[in-house]
């Protein structure tokens, strides 16, 4: 299946919205991207479509449990095997989800940035193929990273511990120059 087949089969659309296809194509070509699109413009599809075409797992760093649950619920309803791993799960549920992911059951896994700093998750990530790391709501890196959620500033440190550097994508509706600069610096995105 190609990108159009994925778009139609899982998401029910015949064509991409303006700006989406360019980002999808860049990711599929192995390029890191920073996608800045208005709320409701379909940023999620820009990483979800490529995630389903790549061989490994896509990790989506997301700031809120409710966002993770909503995204995973919508993906599962569409027939996409996705999961979230966060503090709303018991240790047993986390262990089970990671085991399923190692077996190849999930293409997309949503996590909080703090999860990337745990030994158990790093152990998991070094034993599976991570094709892409996506930072959803990338403005959180600059807005929360300095004090409220410093784990946002450590995403690149996590990436450097992996055997192979995955594609890095980041998406936001907030396009201030500070957000762009911090995203480029802390995710090593191209300018």
Task: Show the residue positions of the predicted features.
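Conserved pre-motif I regulatory segment
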Residues: 1-36
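Walker A/P-loop NTP-binding motif
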Residues: 28, 44-57
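Conserved Walker A/P-loop ATP-binding site and its immediately adjacent core
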Residues: 57-75
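Conserved helix/coil segment N-terminal to the catalytic DExD/H
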Residues: 91-132
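SF2 helicase catalytic motif II
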Residues: 124-164
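Conserved small/polar residues in nucleotide/adenosyl-binding loops
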Residues: 185-191
């Amino acid at each position: 299946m190609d990108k159009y087949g994925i778009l139609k089969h899982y998401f029910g659309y015949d064509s991409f919205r303006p700006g989406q296809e360019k980002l999808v194509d860049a990711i599929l070509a192995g390029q890191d991207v920073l996608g800045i699109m208005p709320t409701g413009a379909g940023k999620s599809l820009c990483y979800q479509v490529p995630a389903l075409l790549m061989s490994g797992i896509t990790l989506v760093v997301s700031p809120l449990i409710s966002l993770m649950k909503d995204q995973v619920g919508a993906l599962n309803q569409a027939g996409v095997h996705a999961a979230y791993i966060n503090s709303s799960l018991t240790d047993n549920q986390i262990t089970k989800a990671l085991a399923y992911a190692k077996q190849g059951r999930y293409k997309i896994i949503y996590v909080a940035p703090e999860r990337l700093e745990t030994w158990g998750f790093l152990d998991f990530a070094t034993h599976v193929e991570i094709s892409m790391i996506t930072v959803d709501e990338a403005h959180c890196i600059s807005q929360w990273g300095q004090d409220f959620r410093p784990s946002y500033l450590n995403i690149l440190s996590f990436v450097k511990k992996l055997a192979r550097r995955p594609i890095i994508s980041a998406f936001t509706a907030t396009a201030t120059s500070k957000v762009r600069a911090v995203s480029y610096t802390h995710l090593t995105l191209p300018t």
